[in-house]
Design a protein with these regions (language model features):
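Class II aminoacyl-tRNA synthetase catalytic cores and aaRS-like
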Residues: 1-575
Length: 575
């Protein structure tokens, strides 16, 4: 089909040129003697002017048309359009295909509910803002390919149908028709295979990898997602981080023309938790946590005295705007973090006010005001618990909430940092069992590895997360390459020898044949695209995403299957 160029390729320099364009009718305005058509293609919109002496068929919104005509200068330019200085004086308009009235407005400013947008995703994708996000995604992938290829990485595809192994989240499983009663699992990550590639001697691997996790969804999660997955041999942590900073610098420059300053900051996990209440802190604003244990333990409030940890944050200038209802809502939020006590104090006339203020003597009140650098009309929130992480994460959630509500985050800014030196394990407060903070293949730090047998809770991990604007945009670690240490980790996690053999036998066996020191990282492609596109909804940057119920309104997946298929698989559904 004849086409001279895309709309956005035309400019004031093309005046007088005869062109043939293809696209959709975005909007039409009939003024009697003149018909104006906004023609939209993947590059943008251009105005087509049809004079009354040019006879064309009836056209309506979203009709697919071909336009032939001459580029002309517009009498009144439109600065909002890239092609706003020019128009096409049509000599011929051909209707290629008609369209029904669409169930949503095909425009950047649509009023459609998200489920409607997802049901008619093929229409939603016509909106320029959606196409822009997919182009951003493609640019990130292209930049990653160019950088990693230039640094001698080899792109390798790993299996999608694999063995179910405990990696943290629940697996999506696929029944085998040939092996009745047996199931494949879709990979939560290519973790084991990329380590096996290192044992196989490839030394530098990468993949744009599809991953699947059956976990609770939120705005920045999907059940099926994409990673820029990377593994390398014979590099230490500093070398890997330096190499990956180069990749990030190229991505930011190529995609949004933003220069990031290297080297990036490195924040230890303990400092991130204690200062910001998060293992993925957004440091574009203050509201830092302060340790007030030594002050509040001297008050007459009994719950302070029975708690090992107390921290506080100051929210500036909102005391008068904070009602009893607001405080009750904060109390409900605090319950999610199992805090022993949670109090809200207002600063008025250089004194504390609130239901808990009576427990503070003058000395404790003055010490609190001084430590927190609190001023009149500020709000002081204090949380206490015998769990430091509960206190920090609870206040960290409120820190982020108030930063958004008070507009403390500067738009169009990027805050990149590494969080390093994580604990290797986390301990369940109810069962007392250990689970890996990252995954069970993470190497302990050399200085704490000797504690594995005696004090696993104090073993640190050679792990690192890249945090951008408060989002974990990627994470990785040095890997265990010693068979004995890997078995020890599995045993600490409560796996029996039979479990280890059945689920990881092939992996452990590979360690017998000369495993190199190795490590890697995976960047969340969806999350990176979300950040660079300036949206907070991961579904906006995926062509065909699932909704918050892990369903696809367009295809109605997941769905029931025919009984004949179930019989082939040897499966019976019990209602």
């Amino acid at each position: 089909m004849e086409r001279t160029c895309y709309n956005a390729n035309l400019s004031i320099n093309d005046i007088g040129r005869t062109v043939t364009l293809l696209g959709w009718v975005s909007r039409r305005r009939n003024l009697g003697s003149l018909l104006f058509i906004d023609l939209r293609d993947r590059s943008g919109i251009i105005q087509v002017t049809v004079k009354d002496d040019v006879h064309i068929p009836d056209v309506r919104n979203e009709y697919v048309i071909q336009v032939k005509g001459q580029v002309a200068k517009k009498d009144v330019p439109n600065p909002k359009l890239k092609t706003g200085e020019i128009e096409i004086l049509a000599s011929e308009v051909v209707v290629i295909n008609e369209a029904m009235t669409t169930p949503l407005i095909i425009d950047d400013e649509t009023d459609a509910l998200e489920d409607v947008r997802l049901k008619y995703r093929y229409l939603d994708l016509r909106r320029p803002t959606m196409q822009g996000k997919l182009k951003t995604r493609a640019k990130i992938v292209r930049a990653a390919h160019e950088y990693l290829d230039a640094h001698d990485f080899i792109e390798v595809e790993t299996p999608i149908l694999t063995l179910s192994t405990p990696e943290g989240a629940r697996d999506y499983v696929v029944p085998s028709r040939i092996h009745h009663g047996s199931f494949y699992a879709l990979p939560q990550s290519p973790q084991l295979f990329k380590q096996l590639l290192m044992i196989g001697g490839l030394e530098r691997y990468y993949q744009i990898a599809r991953c699947f996790r059956d976990e609770d969804l939120r705005a920045d999660r999907q059940p099926d997602f994409t990673q820029i997955d990377i593994e390398t041999s014979f590099l230490d942590e500093d070398q890997i981080l330096t190499l990956m900073e180069g990749l990030l610098k190229k991505v930011f420059k190529d995609v949004i023309d933003h220069d990031i300053v290297l080297p990036l900051r490195r924040l230890k996990y303990d400092e991130a938790l204690n200062r910001y209440g998060s293992d993925k802190p957004d440091t574009r604003f203050g509201l830092e946590l302060k340790d007030v244990t030594s002050i509040v333990s001297k008050t007459s409030f009994p719950l302070f005295n029975s708690s090992a940890y107390s921290k506080a944050i100051v929210i500036p200038g909102i005391a008068d705007r904070t009602s009893r209802k607001n405080i009750d809502e904060l109390q409900l939020e605090a319950k999610k973090f199992r805090l022993s006590s949670f109090i809200v104090l207002k600063v008025k006339n250089n004194r504390l006010e609130g239901s808990a203020a009576k427990f503070f003597g003058d000395g404790e009140a003055d010490a609190l005001l001084q430590l927190m650098s609190a001023h009149n009309e500020d709000l002081i929130i204090i949380a206490s618990s015998n769990s430091l992480s509960n206190v920090c994460f609870g206040l960290g959630a409120l820190r982020s909430k108030y930063a958004r509500e008070l507009g403390l985050i500067k738009p169009n800014t990027f805050d990149l940092l590494w969080v390093v030196d994580f604990p290797l394990f986390e301990k369940d407060q109810d069962s007392g069992k250990f689970s890996p903070l990252h995954h069970p293949f993470t190497r302990p730090t050399p200085s704490t590895a000797d504690l594995l047998a005696s004090d696993p809770g104090n073993v640190h991990a050679s792990a690192y997360d890249i945090v951008i604007n408060g989002y974990e945009a990627g994470g990785g670690s040095l890997r265990i390459y010693d068979q004995k240490m890997q078995k020890t980790i599995f045993e600490i996690l409560g796996l029996s020898q039979e479990d280890i053999k059945n689920k990881f036998g092939f992996f452990i066996d590979a360690f017998k044949y000369g495993t190199p020191p190795h490590g890697g990282i995976a960047f969340g492609l969806d999350r990176l695209t979300m950040i660079l596109s300036g949206t907070d909804n991961i579904r906006d940057v995926i062509a065909f995403p699932k909704n918050l119920r892990a369903a696809c309104p367009m295809t109605d997946a997941p769905s029931k299957i025919d009984k004949s298929q179930l019989d082939e698989l040897g499966i019976k559904i019990i209602e």
